[in-house]
Amino acid sequence: MGIHATWISHLLFADDSMIFMQANKRSADRLACILDTYHRGSGQLVNRQKSAVFFSTNTGPEMKQMVQLSLGIEKEALGEKYLGLPTAVGRVADGTFDYSADRIRNFIHGWGANNLSYAGRELLLKANAQAVPTYPMSCFKLPAPVCKKMKSHISNYWWGSSVDSNKIHWQRWSKLTTPKGEGGMGFRDLPLFNEAMLGKQGWRLITRPDSLCARVLKGKYYPNGDFLSATRKKKSSETWRAILHGRKVLQKGIIKRVGPGDTINIWNDNWIPGIRSMKPLVHLENSLVQHVDELFLPGTRTWDEDLVRQSFIPSDANEILKIRPGLRMDEDTLAWSHEKFGMYTVRSAYRLLKEEQIQLEASKLNEPNSSDGSWIWKRLWKLKIPPKIRIFWWRVVHNFLPTKMELHRRHVEPEATCYTCGAAIECLFHIVFECPVARMFWDEVKKLTGIKIPKLHQATWVKDLLTGDHCSVSSAELIICGVWSLWTGRNARKHGKVEWRSAAAARHISSMLEDFIGSGTDTSSRQEVTRVRWSGPPSGWMKVNTDAAFSLSNSTGSTGAVLRDHSGSVRAAAARFYPCVSDALMAEALAVRDGLILAAEQEATRVVLETDNATVATLVRSDDGFRSVIAGVWHEIRELSLSFASFICTHVNQEGNEAAHLCARRPSASSPVMSWVGDLPNWLMEVANKDCNVESY
């Protein structure tokens, strides 16, 4: 595999074997002898008709023939696939991965779903078509023409219900791949998804350096360095080129968690989570520090606040002081900054790449920030109406309906008068409110449901229905369903398919909406709320409840912890104020640490820890918290938990954590440390007495 690389003689997967050897007669004869010995000893015979030989490009035809004769294998591995991927990929050329685009095309043809609604098409495209290239994308960088073909097939089917459709594409593909909450449909941008998938391979090289793959690639491409600084050589394999392509997204999101700080270069490494670039924004000329450990007080891992403020601009200094260096960390740790757990995920990497693309396109086209109108889309996708009508309203908000006015503007229709009445320009507002057919329909709706159409302005009516200012949400949902019914009726009349009747249409949308709501699609309103109360630990155990308060405006936090026995009797309680905290999750982690310190001080041996933060509870129970956003505190929590004879961590709703909740709101900058042992304040006694009549578990 390379001068410095690990030697590989064979690879085994299930009942398949891949054997590596030099292309010469001596090696071939020796392998044939080994296979024969195996056959005589085990009774199992290699099926040479199903076997194949792959030769490197510098193997001559005579040597190929000699090796094949010695092994008794006639077939040469040319274009063979194993587990769905080409067994050997040299330079990826046009045609190597065309099968992915062909499979998507065949999928769409096989559905035979020309009459599917947009909701049905969305489901099939996301669940099936987009999943086709996922496996090859995890190993190779697919050529741009292949991605373009796949995009074309998906886009054609979306807008025209056929892979060969040439209907109007009302929105460019990059907008369709925008998240639903920002006005798109959330389809995958395939090249970006490909890069995010390949980033996962690079992450494995970083986090699993002892794996066979990592050792082979290191020996061949970066024997004296590390993956993040490795370069691409002229004769690099397609696999290595693909992994380096995925490394780009890794370099955008990798951060170093501060432990000793001696390996973190202040100005070149990513290490400040509160700054978008993860590096100091400004390099002051008078700053002489180079590594993070130089910013600590001598002999500690506590920030030298004066030095930090002298070395950085105020905004950078404030973010640095929020970082809590790991007192128990042996080394600075690489982590993925876009996940709380610090582990790379394809989802978060894709989201990062997509956000960058959206911002870049918006700056080029001088478009407003898509998040400015995000409330519209959030309300739209929360409407309790059938999915096909939600997507219909998405088209309405974007003005994607082929009304005669719009088609005339695009020079598709010669004139723009209404198909039904012929008396006015056919815009959507006319179709659903002004046309005589529409007026009859709304009269029937009023008779049936009692809902009256509010006064709506033609320029803003689409968004007005989503604001809730002109009518209730339930009325707006019925009106939107009515608009959909009028539009489908207009299309039916245009194509002469059915005779559309106002009364029947009104009854249909009313019953459809009732059936949808009653079908159990939305169960949140019917869920019974069960009040959670504090429960005591088993006899002989102690339970410590923890909670935290966090102020986003001034980045301060406070913690509270209450230690009780199985009867509910409070043994001790404590609270502490922290003047510089990065976020609410860090405050909750500090509360857990303080709670365990309290339990240790009271000489508890069997401890149940209870917190109302599910993320912190999961991290405390996990062995992978060393990369998380609370990495420094996580190591302290882990060390404290191991000091007890028995330790359990559980999550509880806030209602069952009232005592700790009240404690966390007591300390302040003027009274930063508070503790109670024996003589408890009245407010804490009230909560304890209310909780103490519960049974232990």
Located regions from the model:
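A helix-boundary/hinge signal
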Residues: 1-697
